[in-house]
Regions:
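S-adenosyl-L-methionine-dependent methyltransferase catalytic core, i.e., the SAM/SAH-binding region
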Residues: 1-194
Length: 194
């Protein structure tokens, strides 16, 4: 360990608050690892996985209110379709959202198996050859529940603001949505540089 390095566990969209709590104004470098906790994803009872059955939860932070169960049972068909398409890059998003809404009129969607069943019926069998058919929808709902993409623009902006001159910002992304959001924020920040 280095004496001039501080490792901080926290949410990246609170970077200014974290530094303020540490009484640090400026830093020479920031490393942001945007990856999700595989420990949490592997914990079947947390409802992240489309393999096995569990209550629909998907919260990284168990204290937050929004759950996957709330998303699939309370969001409008239009909003569900948008989330599944944008965050899951799922081309059958409209059909999945429509079938979720049809199913929940009869019965509350409470488990991962129920959601998987709906998704599998929403995607033509001939198109179910690119991994598990629920993969993209589960990713989309997880991203929505944990607000994983929206704060990235501000995180990049705030990180740049707290860097010393010639400071370095390193961001590790894990999927194209994060990558795209970070690139857009960097391009916007570059435009502000003189």
């Amino acid at each position: 360990m280095y004496s001039n390095v501080k490792y901080v566990y926290g949410n990246h969209d609170n970077i200014k608050e974290v530094l303020n709590d540490l009484e640090i104004e400026k830093v020479d470098g920031i490393l942001l690892d945007l990856g999700v906790s595989s420990y949490q994803l592997d914990e079947k009872s947390r409802g992240f996985s489309y393999i096995g059955n569990a209550e629909l939860d998907m919260r990284m932070d168990q204290d937050q209110e929004l759950t996957a169960k709330k998303v699939v049972n309370e969001y409008s068909e239009e909003n569900l379709s948008k989330i599944i398409f944008e965050y899951g890059e799922e081309r059958f998003a409209r059909n999945i959202a429509k079938n979720i809404c049809i199913y929940r009129k009869e019965k509350t969607i409470e488990t991962t198996n129920q959601l998987v069943e709906i998704i599998e019926k929403s995607i033509p069998k001939a198109k179910q050859n690119d991994g598990h058919p629920a993969k993209r929808t589960f990713q989309a709902i997880r991203i929505e529940v944990n607000n994983e993409i929206k704060p990235l623009m501000n995180t990049v902006k705030d990180s740049i603001e707290v860097l010393n001159k010639n400071g370095r910002l390193v961001i590790i992304t894990f999927h194209s949505l994060e990558d795209r959001a970070v690139k857009e924020a960097m391009i916007e920040a570059e435009g502000r540089c003189t």
